[in-house]
């Protein structure tokens, strides 16, 4: 993902076949409403710069054909963004935990964005205030609160391409690639 200095970006997928990297998809993307940063903070509207593995694939729709473990979201699924909760930056099933937070994304409440999505493994140490709930998800037609979004068709294509060792690189601009 390469930003343009604002909240637009280009997402490019490269696949390694027989030792050779090949571009297999390039598409328009949106990032945080306040751009991309190397100093992400909770609620800043910025997408975190860096290279990350990918976590749980999920969505309100059924598995679109990804080989990754798929969670079909229901009314009990939340991603906690309350910095004072022991569940900060974690996916939880409230039927198992109860509500032990003051703020969280109720995943089913975002039917367009989270029709198909995958977690970006950002802040997996759950450092309070460093940012939470960073996903690659379907576009809603506007900038995100810190996630990366692409069209639903591109999101499905990406999910189908994912391998277990897939990484996502997020860069502020082309110059920061080198």
PLM feature spans:
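Cell wall/extracellular polymer interaction/catalysis modules
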Residues: 1-144, 155-167, 171-178
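Extended catalytic/binding region for NAD+/ADP-ribose chemistry, centered on the ART fold
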Residues: 146-150
